[in-house]
């Protein structure tokens, strides 16, 4: 299995001969190394509806025929208003099996909406974190979130091999809370900081996060770099 980071919260997972992308913010992402014209995916998984996560989902889904997995509200919105054919709606606590592995959505403390060109926001369900089980490994993508103690329950129920955690502050956890979440609650084998440096408001030094973490290994990935099992 291979996990690649592509700026902000975009993760590309390759496992069981399938390709999965999380939060495909590609075209307008100054930190993303991917090209929307050449990306190949079988599944798209969404944590919530903000533009820097919802991103290129419509174009990518139509171009590739990928199945979009997200909240029931996002699935309905994509199907009804954008003509995306392959959607799979879920909600917090739900788990579903796919041919690459399983997806379980868990709690995240954030917000979730998508703003139309007319400026009107559309509610797209609750924000969510994702627990993947692929090739015998557990990956926890926290999504955009603040710190909450039930991260420890998530990790107790699903011992984490790799955790993708936001460190950008302002809109999500910063370095202090993110490192606390890793050290005290999640305790993964590998931590990867995400959701930073894309915009001035979330500029951070990931080395400070690495220095603050005292469990497992911290991998600071540049866009396009990966961890592999």
UniProtKB/Swiss-Prot annotation:
Keyword hit for Mitochondrion: no
Similarity section: Belongs to the UPF0173 family.
CDD domains: metallo-hydrolase-like_MBL-fold
Signal peptide: none
Protein name: UPF0173 metal-dependent hydrolase SAOUHSC_01815
Gene3D superfamilies: Ribonuclease Z/Hydroxyacylglutathione hydrolase-like
Keywords noted in UniProt: Hydrolase
Organism: Staphylococcus aureus (strain NCTC 8325 / PS 47)
Entries under InterPro entries matching the protein: Metallo-B-lactamas, RibonucZ/Hydroxyglut_hydro, UPF0173, UPF0173_UPF0282_UlaG_hydrolase
HAMAP family: UPF0173 (MF_00457)
